């Protein structure tokens, strides 16, 4: 079994940097991108080769404020206008607010995204000796996600929670072939990172909870734990 892929992507953009004049409170970027993807797959006779070529052209922009200490934000979006990219789009944004709480620094981060994209090429086409599929009728995956994050610097605490909705989720079924779920799938998640330090001893901890609305299509462990205990010290000065 063999397959090959060659991809070339070019992006042309123009940017107005944040602060280029006194009225520019944020940076602004516009761009256009073209991606050419060439795939070679074996045919059913295992001798000849099937060739696939896909073009994607997107236009998009970004609005971002990165300067300053209190408030930062970024929003970026792109939409497909030619060939395989038609009907596809991606929009994502994030915002972080930093403020003092007593003698500590607290950061609140909010993230959101929405996208409508084709499943990966090898989910749509794959040829081998034991598995062979051409799924030309697959629908685009529509995803929306919201996430919030809280960081407390002095306590070395990070708390994160998010929710995601996926329509036409693409997965491998029990026959190890790609399939799309009809309707929507929801995923809830929350995680806590808490680090401790006592002299040269360090203990990093992460607890993650997650829940899928369809465990058959997207099985997820309810709880996962990570712990890392180590010592950190200097062997020599000025080294």
Over which residues does each language-model region extend?
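Exposed, low-structure sequence patches enriched in small/polar residues
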Residues: 1-239
């Amino acid at each position: 079994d063999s397959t090959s892929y060659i991809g070339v992507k070019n992006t042309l953009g123009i940017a107005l940097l944040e602060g280029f004049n006194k009225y520019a409170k944020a940076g602004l970027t516009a761009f256009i991108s073209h991606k050419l993807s060439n795939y070679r797959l074996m045919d059913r006779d295992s001798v000849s080769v099937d060739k696939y070529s896909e073009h994607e052209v997107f236009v998009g922009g970004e609005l971002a404020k990165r300067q300053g200490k209190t408030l930062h934000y970024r929003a970026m979006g792109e939409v497909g206008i030619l060939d395989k990219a038609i009907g596809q789009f991606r929009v994502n944004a994030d915002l972080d607010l930093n403020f003092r709480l007593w003698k500590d620094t607290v950061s609140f981060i909010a993230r959101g995204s929405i996208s409508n994209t084709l499943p990966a090429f090898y989910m749509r086409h794959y040829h081998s000796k034991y598995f062979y599929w051409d799924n030309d009728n697959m629908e685009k995956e529509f995803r929306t996600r919201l996430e919030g994050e809280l960081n407390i610097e002095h306590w070395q605490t990070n708390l994160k929670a998010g929710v995601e909705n996926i329509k036409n989720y693409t997965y491998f079924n029990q026959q190890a072939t790609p399939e799309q779920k009809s309707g929507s799938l929801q995923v809830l998640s929350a995680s806590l990172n808490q680090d401790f330090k006592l002299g040269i001893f360090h203990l990093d901890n992460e607890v993650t909870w997650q829940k899928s609305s369809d465990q058959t299509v997207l099985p997820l462990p309810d709880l996962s734990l990570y712990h890392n205990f180590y010592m950190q010290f200097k062997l020599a000065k000025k080294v």
